[in-house]
């Protein structure tokens, strides 16, 4: 045990020294360094405990912002970890940063599981976790992320609250129902175990005493009787009234982060006379034959703004498997359709998603995706 502590101490010192490099690191918003955390540890240790919220996507940041609004006066530290960095991520990170006491953006362009990234990043996260003041609650959506376990294992007595990460919380094959973290390579697995001890996905799931869901009336994988389920409406369209739809029709295809969807998306756009594509926040490719909607807003926020400006326009939203279909289906003047390529086999992995759309009253439109 003495040797393990000594090794961890040396590791902490090394990572802390390298943390100085991030003091003026614009890529990480200048707050990935450990200086601010060290100040808290030294001077605010006896203050009010903090709440940690971990986010990996823009949707998760939206949920986190709503959770924070329910606890005015409490201290919140937000940690965003993402392989992506673009206008949308910056916009929503700055939104939540303004409402949190501290916010940290870990931009990991090559992903955490890359060999050269994993060990230094996990060590850095462990050091940062130990520099935090007292932690009261930890909120997270991505139960399968071993990076969060670096914090969970440091504060095993903190309350754990979970929240939705899109349709993954509505499908029984979700990775959130797994038991152990997926870490490739013996060296990385052993290092992860040193950083997180015996923490696991199952331990996180079982420790959660409350789950926030953004989907009303749909069976959630976290709704197993072990915890309180709290509905958290994410997008408020209550003040908008349905118009007579005499102002024309706007058809929008929701993009996908998967590059292999490019060709099939272009065929769908042509088949259904779709004029616009709303790129997925993690999408890096464009589509020909349609106009790209360049906006810092996610599609739900964008559409709500458009409805206010054009209350008599009919909006048709087309998607392959985006969870935004479920969050927008009840917006006034909005009609959502799920696209199903005819070439998909019956046992394709999207089958549960289409079943979910059907259950929610979203029409499934099959089209010929072959020339």
Curated annotation (Swiss-Prot):
Major subcellular location class: membrane
InterPro entries noted in UniProt: Glyco_transf_52 (IPR012477)
A biological process term (GO) from this entry: lipopolysaccharide biosynthetic process
Location relative to the cell: Cell outer membrane
Family designation: Belongs to the glycosyltransferase 52 family.
Record's function text: Catalyzes the transfer of sialic acid from the substrate CMP-N-acetylneuraminate to the terminal galactose residue of the lacto-N-neotetraose branch of surface lipooligosaccharide (LOS), forming an alpha-2,3-sialyl linkage. Thus, functions in the sialylation of LOS, which plays a role in the evasion of the host immune response by protecting N.meningitidis from complement-mediated serum killing and from phagocytic killing by neutrophils.
UniProt protein name: N-acetyllactosaminide alpha-2,3-sialyltransferase
Chain's gene name: lst
